[in-house]
Curated annotation (Swiss-Prot):
S-adenosyl-L-methionine binds at residues 212, 241, 262, 307. One of its GO terms (molecular function) is iron ion binding. Catalyzes the formation of 5-methyl-uridine at position 747 (m5U747) in 23S rRNA. It catalyses: uridine(747) in 23S rRNA + S-adenosyl-L-methionine = 5-methyluridine(747) in 23S rRNA + S-adenosyl-L-homocysteine + H(+). PANTHER family: RNA M5U METHYLTRANSFERASE (PTHR11061), TRNA (URACIL(54)-C(5))-METHYLTRANSFERASE (PTHR11061:SF30). This is 23S rRNA (uracil(747)-C(5))-methyltransferase RlmC. Keywords: 4Fe-4S, Iron, Iron-sulfur, Metal-binding, Methyltransferase, rRNA processing, S-adenosyl-L-methionine, Transferase. [4Fe-4S] cluster binds at residues 3, 11, 14, 87. Its EC number is 2.1.1.189. It comes from Escherichia coli O17:K52:H18 (strain UMN026 / ExPEC). GO terms for biological process: rRNA base methylation. The active site is at residue 334.
Length: 375
């Protein structure tokens, strides 16, 4: 992938950009095999990759510069701002949005937040696109509600320029720290969730719910999990750390009993909406801590699917699963290092199948799906 920002030394986020994709996949596969070297793996499936540019459905832009000439991008470690509107990871559809946002920031008087001086209002612009219909969700992250009335007043101009903006919100993040969002979300549109579709499964995106950033590869990840589950004698499963329900909604059949657990209420609202659309009445989604939910149960289903954050599922949940011994565990991980550590805590299981998904091209990161079977 060619990137003028990288070539000019202005951005180094894509550290592997000079390596061809096949070389990147080989290096990632070698890393994964090294992490799982102590465990016999019955089947290594071929790695899955997607487009090498224009694949991201989300932009997280630090706003800097001045109200008349805002920059959208990032801050270097020394505080120097860098405009990343031309980043080739973003689809072409993002360019007109960035182009309209810059004059809008001036129109609305949204002074960019200055980290060094701790002054200003507009901290971040968060943009998400639906791969199914091109609709977009735009979030303004502000330090306070001081400029909210001005933003509302100027908003009709932006909506006229960009009719693809279906959901627009203001998030209030008052803390002087590099935290992307605060707890308060103020909706400026009637529509509160963005509709998307993966493999004919409706998924909804709300402001404070996690959603995969590479739809092409995520679609294949969900479809693979569905195919693996369909090959197993399973009538009841848990989907822990379920997010908006991507895995569970793909894996469930009308006859299957499924419980999805996720701590974020916004994500659970999305999952419930999807289940209702699909007419899946035996699916239950609850906004709870996944570990606390599981360890409070006196029995387990045949299959437990886990998709934890980078820290992994942790020893308490591993100990519980070891004791309760569900027949199958499917582990989806964005950090193979913590997954390997967790598998070490599950000595009663063997690795049936592993597949790498290149969700993050040009970096050392990847997603991995692992099927564990009770010995």
């Amino acid at each position: 992938m060619q990137c003028a920002l990288y070539d000019a030394g202005r951005c180094r986020s894509c550290q592997w950009i000079t390596q061809p994709i096949p070389e990147q996949l080989s290096a990632k596969t070698a890393d994964l095999k090294n992490l799982l070297a102590d465990f016999p793996v019955e089947e290594w499936c071929a790695p899955v990759s997607g487009p090498e540019q224009g694949f991201r459905n989300k932009a997280k832009m630090v706003v800097s510069g001045s109200v008349e000439k805002p920059l959208l991008g990032m801050l270097h470690r020394d505080g120097t701002p860098e405009d990343l509107c031309d980043c080739p990871l973003y689809p072409a559809s993002f360019a007109p949005v960035f182009a309209a946002l810059k004059p809008f920031i001036a129109r609305a008087g949204l002074t960019p937040y200055n980290v060094a001086r701790k002054r200003g209002e507009l901290k971040y612009i968060l943009l998400t696109e639906s791969q199914s219909d091109g609709g977009m969700m735009l979030r303004f992250v502000l330090r306070s509600e001081t400029k909210l009335a001005q933003l509302r007043k100027a908003l009709p101009w932006l909506q006229e320029q960009l009719p693809q903006l279906k959901v627009i919100t203001v998030n209030i993040q008052p803390v002087h720290m590099a935290i992307m969002e605060g707890e308060t979300e103020i909706y400026l549109t009637e529509q509160q969730a963005l509709a998307d579709r993966f493999n004919d499964v409706p998924l909804w995106i709300r402001p404070q719910s996690f959603f995969q950033t590479n739809p092409a590869v995520a679609s294949q990840l969900y479809a693979t999990a569905r195919d693996w589950v369909r090959q197993l004698p399973v009538n009841h499963m848990w989907d822990l750390f379920c997010g908006v329900g991507g895995f569970g909604l793909h894996c469930a059949t009308p006859d299957m009993q499924l419980t999805g657990i996720e701590i974020a209420p916004e994500a659970i609202a999305c999952a419930k909406q999807s289940a209702a659309e699909l007419g899946l009445t035996r699916l239950q989604f609850q906004a709870l801590d996944s570990t606390q939910f599981a360890t409070a149960q006196g029995e387990v289903p045949e299959l437990v699917l886990v998709n934890p954050p980078r820290r992994g599922i942790g020893k308490p949940l591993c100990d519980y699963l070891s004791t309760m011994a569900p027949r199958f565990i499917i582990y989806s991980s964005c950090n193979a290092q913590t997954m390997a550590k967790d598998i070490r805590e599950l000595p009663g299981y063997r690795i049936e199948r592993v597949q790498l998904f290149d969700m993050f091209p040009h970096t050392a990161h990847y997603e991995v799906l692992t099927l564990l079977v009770k010995m």
